[in-house]
Amino acid sequence: MKFLWAALVVTLLAGCRADVEEEVKLGQEPDRWQAKQPWEQALGRFWEYLRWVQTLSNKVKEELLNSQVTEELKLLIEETMKEVKAYKEELEKQVGPIAQETQARLSKELQAAQARLESDMEDVRTRLAQYRSEAQAALGQNTDDLQGRLASHLRKLRKRLLRDAEDLQKRLAVYQAGTREAAERGVSAVHERLGPLMMEGPLQAIPPSQQLRERAEAWGQKVRGRLESVGSQARDRLDDMRDQMEELKAKVEEQASQVRLQAEAFQTRLKSWFEPLVQDMQRQWASLVEKVQSTLGISPSTKPSKTK
């Protein structure tokens, strides 16, 4: 049984670290988190969705003005936390109770790690909402600076999220190890009591690791289906938002063209107003000059004679 539980731990944790390190490289296409626990699959889907938003062009990033993106992230956060809780409860059912003091300590540490991870995911969603507000305030202006700050914040939040996700993995492993040791101690006591009977005939039992693995796979398929549905709906909504942004851009360009034409027409009108006035002033000035010259006895065409 100890060997089976050791194999289970290796199966649960294998590949997790490698995939976490791959996540740091934004350009790599992530796997579908099939080798992980349901809560890790949900977390992976959360970041895959966010990464997909980051890869959009600057023009399309303005789609974040719609609050639907943050609502989809909220749904993924709730799904992740739900699967973490379900996984912890499943561990408790499979391996049985442990010492009350140990269980209280491990549960407290696990809840703290879970809260940190949830806080990191909420910070990501909050930062996107803040960007949406700032972008609305700067509508029609250059948003390169806002997008740069958003990318910088998301990189920092990503590092913190991955760090706390790894910490939660370790806490779950410790919790599982503690419950497994308690179960093994109970099995050892039963083995000592039933030793003579076991000599007469071997006991047959279904390995608990098999049941846990099957349930984990079932959860994975169920959650994967939900998240794929959510992702598909989100992409459809973003496509609609992209079309709306294109329509808005066309309207803005049309209005700008109309304003430009109106300005040109107004300029022409002003010119038609003031041109006769200027011409009239020029005529009056020429007339005044002639009168002054006439009064002084100066002919406009007469040149002063040279003194011999």
Curated annotation (Swiss-Prot):
APOE is an apolipoprotein, a protein associating with lipid particles, that mainly functions in lipoprotein-mediated lipid transport between organs via the plasma and interstitial fluids. APOE is a core component of plasma lipoproteins and is involved in their production, conversion and clearance. Apolipoproteins are amphipathic molecules that interact both with lipids of the lipoprotein particle core and the aqueous environment of the plasma. Its main location: secreted. One of its GO terms (biological process) is lipoprotein metabolic process. Sequence repeats lie at residues 75-96, 97-118, 119-140, 141-162, 163-184, 185-206, 207-224, 225-246. The lineage of its organism: Eukaryota, Metazoa, Chordata, Craniata, Vertebrata. Residues 205-281 are annotated as: Lipid-binding and lipoprotein association. Homotetramer. May interact with ABCA1; functionally associated with ABCA1 in the biogenesis of HDLs. May interact with APP/A4 amyloid-beta peptide; the interaction is extremely stable in vitro but its physiological significance is unclear. May interact with MAPT. May interact with MAP2. In the cerebrospinal fluid, interacts with secreted SORL1. Interacts with PMEL; this allows the loading of PMEL luminal fragment on ILVs to induce fibril nucleation. Heparin binds at L157, R158, K159, R160, G220, Q221, K222, V223, R224, G225, R226, L227. Residues 257-308 are annotated as: Homooligomerization. Residues 153-163 are annotated as: LDL and other lipoprotein receptors binding. Residues 1-18 form the signal peptide. It comes from the Eukaryota. This is Apolipoprotein E. Keywords: Chylomicron, Endosome, Extracellular matrix, Glycoprotein, HDL, Heparin-binding, Lipid transport, Lipid-binding, Oxidation, Phosphoprotein, Repeat, Secreted, Signal, Transport, VLDL. It is found in: Secreted; Secreted, Extracellular space; Secreted, Extracellular space, Extracellular matrix; Extracellular vesicle. GO terms for cellular component: chylomicron; extracellular exosome; high-density lipoprotein particle; low-density lipoprotein particle; multivesicular body, internal vesicle; very-low-density lipoprotein particle. Residues 75-246 are annotated as: 8 X 22 AA approximate tandem repeats. It holds the Pfam family Apolipoprotein. One of its GO terms (molecular function) is cholesterol transfer activity. The gene is APOE. APOE exists as multiple glycosylated and sialylated glycoforms within cells and in plasma. The extent of glycosylation and sialylation are tissue and context specific. Glycated in plasma VLDL. Belongs to the apolipoprotein A1/A4/E family. Residues 269-281 are annotated as: Specificity for association with VLDL. It comes from Pteropus vampyrus (Large flying fox).
